Amino acid sequence: MMSLRICLLATCLLVAAHASKDASNDRLKPTKWLTATELENVPSLNDITWERLENQPLEQGAKVIEKIYHVGQIKHDLTPSFVPSPSNVPVWIIKSNGQKVECKLNNYVETAKAQPGFGEDEVTIVLTGLPKTSPAQQKAMRRLIQAYVQKYNLQQLQKNAQEQQQQLKSSDYDYTSSEEAADQWKSAKAASGDLIIIDLGSTLTNFKRYAMLDVLNTGAMIGQTLIDLTNKGVPQEIIHLIGQGISAHVAGAAGNKYTAQTGHKLRRITGLDPAKVLSKRPQILGGLSRGDADFVDAIHTSTFAMGTPIRCGDVDFYPNGPSTGVPGSENVIEAVARATRYFAESVRPGSERNFPAVPANSLKQYKEQDGFGKRAYMGLQIDYDLRGDYILEVNAKSPFGQRSPAHKQAAYHGMHHAQN
């Protein structure tokens, strides 16, 4: 009798386990995420073009990306397969005067080291992640390069500002924005360094290549060049790696490759709107995350479109809170590029504190001054001890930063005054 009860119990457990497995599998069916009509209307990767995404309204383009992402995550039918050839990846070494030295990924280390003074100060390496044909991308990269040229030419700018102020003292000119900029440059810190643009985005000539990019292997390829740089005398402590969109994850993989082979970490990796990874290998973790460098920060500008809502760094900034796109972005590509525009603005001398932010879980909490912790500044001059999620408000047009101080929460504000 006892053995019969045991058999019945075992049978019930097996049935329950099987039912639970069926229920779990049922939850993973695409029809549980999308309607049958929506599934039928999910376009293939070959049907999506960059031009189409730029011409579609932001919300419409975001829905297309979301559908592809969810179906791919459930069906696991998108396996990364595209790794650009190093000889096909353009690289530009930007001199302090703005002049570009063009080379390729397979020879940029030697070309860079041949430049006078290269690697004596900070080295900033930017991995693009959007097609170079995009007007939004062209403008974003132009602004970023201009900002770094200004930063590395600050001593000359300060000299020019002093001369300009001397001329204005003997005139009746009104105080204008150019004079205000001159005052900002006077108080900014002088710095020098080198800027390298690895134009990975130029190899993403169509959306399918973008979706099928092998982040891990491409990152390992980039990481090897960073190892070559340090082997030629460039300390990892002065390297700042910046990844845009999908290339934010490439930057993370590059950092992992560097650490695995050298036992050291890069000083900093910044993700400019880290993307949703549309294709990945099952059971393999990937993507930008804490630990890929000594310090990892990310700016999210299209969390519900091409960007990911997942925390990627030691500190993550969400301008205007997690959203499809930040104010002023009209399509999904422009929404991604805005993170680059924001970062560029923070690089420009005198604008380092244009983006005050506070720790908060939502824009509503931020506006109600119900956040927690102290104010911080998004962008280049970030404090490396920051941790958590930060919210801030931005303008729809340039200048994007709202220079007025971010909200101080009641608790922190009171504690601050009590200490002073």
From Swiss-Prot:
Q: Which GO terms describe its cellular component?
A: extracellular region; extracellular space; P granule
Gene induction: By beta-ecdysone; in males.
Ordered alphabetically, the record's keywords are:
Phosphoprotein, Secreted, Signal, Sulfation
The GO molecular function terms of this record are: serine hydrolase activity
Among InterPro entries, the record links this protein to: AB_hydrolase_fold, Lipase, TAG_lipase
Leader sequence range is 1-19
Q: Summarize the PTM comment.
A: Tyrosine sulfation occurs in the female only and plays an essential functional role.
Is Signal one of the keywords?
yes
Give all Sulfotyrosine modified positions. Answer: Y384, Y390
Residues bearing PTM Phosphothreonine: T37
Question: Is Transport one of the keywords UniProt gives this record?
Answer: no
One Pfam match, given by its short name, reads Lipase
Tissue localization of expression: Synthesized in the fat body and ovarian follicle cells and accumulate in the oocyte.
* Compartment list: Secreted
The cross-references to PANTHER family, in alphabetical order and at most eight, read:
FI01450P-RELATED, LIPASE
Write out the function statement from the record.
Vitellogenin is the major yolk protein of eggs where it is used as a food source during embryogenesis. Vitellogenins and their receptor yl/yolkless are required for maintenance of microtubule plus-end orientation towards the posterior pole of oocytes. Involved in polarized localization of germ plasm components, such as osk mRNA and vas protein, to the oocyte posterior cortex. Receptor-mediated endocytosis by yl/yolkless is crucial for actin reorganization, mediated by osk isoform A/Long, required to anchor germ plasm components to the oocyte cortex.
Entry protein name: Vitellogenin-3
Q: Which organism is it from?
A: Drosophila melanogaster
Q: Which gene encodes it?
A: Yp3
